Regions:
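Active-site-adjacent beta->alpha loops and helix N-cap segments on the catalytic face
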Residues: 85-89
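Short, acidic/turn-prone active-site loops that include or flank metal/cofactor-
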Residues: 56, 99-106, 247-248
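Histidine-acidic metal/acid-base catalytic patches
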Residues: 2-24, 29-70, 132-133, 146, ...
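Catalytic domains of carbohydrate-active enzymes, especially glycoside hydrolases
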Residues: 65-84
Length: 302
């Protein structure tokens, strides 16, 4: 029997309908609009270990957010005060990343080294005592008197002061790359941030040469600054220690207002063998914040 284009399209449509009929839901897409989001979604596949960056859902109380995460099926939280860690653990959630120094005052400037070393050391000890595995670090902002090569050397010098302890305690220090292009909001972009080129961040990590220093690959920031996200995930898979998400442009929901194909990105991450956490770090704009988180969780539950 001769098969034409119309027959093929009809067969594909029938297959899609049958899939929806028997699974009860359509496959999640990054371009699903708010009015099509599933208000009852719970994570089913769980191949991506999803977490949430707590500050993005302010002013929602931390424990209210934690209970929502548990109900949806997220398995961890980060970016919250350590005073909540015991309650988070009682809910059965992990802490996927522990804070240290801020992104503005980083090791680019030697004047910040003592403070960075102190805060990173405290966070490593906290992780080791509580059974957590990752601590965040940043480069800090550029300084006019410091050229790029000197800035790189300064960062390396500072990190090498704390990495022996991290290695001993089996803790991973995660360097976050941030975009410097978006100046529309203080947390959507960070003009002046030194580590704004993901390739440069990887160069610094490789020059340090420690398995306890990895890249925090923020998909949103990489898309803004460098693009070619999936190729870079594959290229840098051996140095990636953590992931963040958000829609671009706007650092908002993973919906039809943004350009990143998150199901494709999540599948690419899985194909690299990565088994760590992917933290949702979008700033919700929908009136229903819980629905926004459910939607993002569904998009990433590939």
């Amino acid at each position: 029997m001769k098969t034409n284009r119309r027959t093929l399209l009809k067969t594909a449509a029938t297959t899609a309908f049958a899939t929806t009929l028997f699974t009860g839901s359509k496959p999640a897409r990054a371009q699903t609009p708010m009015n099509n989001a599933n208000p009852k979604f719970r994570i089913r596949n769980g191949r991506i270990k999803q977490s949430i960056m707590g500050w993005t859902f302010n002013p929602m109380p931390t424990l209210e957010l934690a209970k929502l995460c548990k109900e949806i099926g997220l398995v961890a939280m980060e970016g919250i005060s350590p005073k909540f860690y015991p309650k988070i653990r009682e809910l059965g959630l992990d802490i996927s990343l522990v804070g240290s120094h801020g992104f503005k005052k980083g090791p680019v400037d030697p004047a910040n080294h003592d403070e960075c070393v102190e805060k990173i050391t405290q966070s490593i000890e906290l992780c080791a005592s509580a059974g957590y595995k990752r601590v965040i670090t940043f480069t800090g902002m550029k300084a006019e008197r410091i050229d790029d090569e000197e800035a790189i050397k300064n960062c390396i010098t500072c990190w090498k002061k704390v990495l022996p302890l991290a290695e001993k305690k089996k803790i991973t220090l995660c360097l976050e790359h941030l975009n410097s292009r978006d100046d529309s909001h203080p947390m959507k972009g960070h003009p002046g941030y030194f580590g704004d080129d993901v390739d440069r961040c990887v160069e610094m990590i490789n020059r340090v040469g420690s398995s306890s220093l990895k890249l925090l690959f923020d998909v949103y920031h990489v898309q803004v600054m460098n693009g070619d996200v999936i190729r870079r995930i594959n290229q840098y898979k051996d140095v990636i220690g953590h992931y963040h998400t958000a829609g671009n442009p706007g650092r908002a929901e993973l919906d039809d207002t943004q350009e990143i194909n998150y199901p494709g990105v999540m599948n690419a991450i899985l194909k690299t063998g990565y088994d760590g956490y992917v933290a949702q770090e979008f700033i919700p704009t929908w009136d229903d914040k819980a629905l926004a988180l459910r939607h993002a969780a569904e998009v990433c539950d590939v």
